[in-house]
Structure formats: structure tokens, C-alpha cells
Regions:
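Noncatalytic alpha-helical scaffold of FAD-dependent oxidoreductases
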Residues: 1-189
């Protein structure tokens, strides 16, 4: 949700709860979700913390169009990753033009994808991470995105298991806003 989720206040929001029972009012949490802390303040918060995973692995799923990446996302989330994040062609082009990120793009990005979905798994058991990455590769190929196909660009998955490799992609992705703001033109995406 981006911005104020005013739609959560309409009567439809009161119709059914997630468990299918009749609603008993409006859940204000839905209104607050996009407000970036501008609609309320908290005097006490209870968090459920989980330990950091011992190992993370990452798959960079390359797609020839933005829309094909978005369509594939609904399938990829069924693998239960800890994160699925988009890096689009605008971000990739800007990263190529910035000297600190150019080597990252040249090393890990194959061809000229229109979109990359960064899929992360973080299981305690390294064998389970390996199994999940294999399932990711298979799913992406089954969806029709494999470099083994004869067309000019069909996509595929680059696997990253080393912490340093993943950190380079994460740094590029997390710096996305700064990269976008570094554009020299008045028209920013």
C-alpha cells in the first residue's frame, strides 16, 4: 500500500473478516499501513522477534518484460521465500551508469533483462536452501524462462550462495532510491 489506504474505511471493509465471519468494525491497521507513521503514534509496541538465519541464498530471476516478471511473482511466492523484490530496467540502466554498481551489474546480470526478481531463501539447513534454489530454477524454467531456449532472450535464474555476492546485489537494490534520485534529467521515474 502506498499512501493513505482510505479504501479500508468504506463499508465493504466491514463486510467479512479474513476468517469469513461477519465483520465487527473497521481495522484501523489497514488505514495506517501506508501512512509512514503520519496518522498515529504508539506508546507501546510488542514485537515477535526471530533469530537471524544462519545462511541466506538468492536467485536472480531474469525476465524479458516487466509484465512477465509480475506475472511470475505469483508463482514464485508459492516456494515460500523470505523475500521477492523487483529490480526493473530503469534501475539496472542507472546502476550500469554509476561506477560503484557497474561491476555488480556486469557480473550478475545476464543480457538485457527488462526486470529481475530477487528471490531470497533463509533456511537453517543448507541442504534445504539448495533444494529451494533448485525448485526456483525449475519453476522459472517451467514458466518458460530458460537460457537453454533458442530465442534471443528468454530469461533464467542466476544463483548466488556466497554472502559477498548477495551483499553486492542487496546494496545495489537498497540504494535504488538514491540511484533514481541521481538521474540528471528532470523526468524521474
Amino acid at each position: 500500500v502506498g499512501g493513505y489506504n482510505i479504501d479500508s474505511l468504506v463499508p465493504d471493509a466491514m463486510a467479512l473478516r479474513p476468517d469469513g465471519k461477519a465483520g465487527d468494525g473497521i481495522n484501523l491497521a489497514h488505514l495506517l499501513v501506508g501512512s509512514e507513521g503520519t496518522l498515529a503514534y504508539s506508546t507501546a509496541i510488542t514485537l515477535k522477534l526471530s533469530p537471524l538465519p544462519a545462511r541466506k541464498v538468492m536467485g536472480l530471476c531474469h525476465f524479458p518484460t516487466f509484465y512477465k516478471a509480475m506475472d511470475a511473482a505469483q508463482h514464485l511466492v508459492t516456494l515460500d521465500p523470505v523475500a521477492v523484490e523487483l529490480i526493473d530496467s530503469t534501475m539496472l540502466d542507472l546502476a550500469r551508469s554509476i561506477s560503484i554498481f557497474r561491476p555488480t551489474v556486469e557480473t550478475y546480470i545476464k543480457g538485457e533483462p527488462a526486470a529481475i526478481l530477487v528471490v531470497e531463501f533463509a533456511e537453517e539447513d543448507p541442504a534445504e536452501n539448495t533444494r529451494r534454489l533448485a525448485a526456483l530454477e525449475t519453476m522459472v524454467a517451467d514458466l518458460g524462462f530458460s537460457w537453454d531456449k533458442p530465442s534471443a532472450f528468454t530469461g533464467g535464474t542466476v544463483i548466488l550462495t556466497e554472502d559477498d555476492d548477495q551483499a553486492r546485489i542487496s546494496e545495489m537494490r537498497k540504494s535504488g532510491l538514491n540511484i533514481m534520485m541521481s538521474m540528471k534529467t528532470a523526468a524521474k521515474p
